[in-house]
Amino acid sequence: MSVKARLDALKERHAALESRITDEDQRPRPDSETLTRLKIEKLRVKEEMERLRTQAE
């Protein structure tokens, strides 16, 4: 998989996680464990995107 393709896939994953976080947060009683897990995963995806961008330069 090329770097661009990997970055595109990570961007999609990041957007999907953001959507899931928003959905969970808007529930009447959001599950804090789920929110924490989703936010950690989103951060990992963001860090991977930054790492790939740095390598591509």
Which residue stretches match the model-derived regions?
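Extended, charge-rich alpha-helical interface modules
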Residues: M1-E57
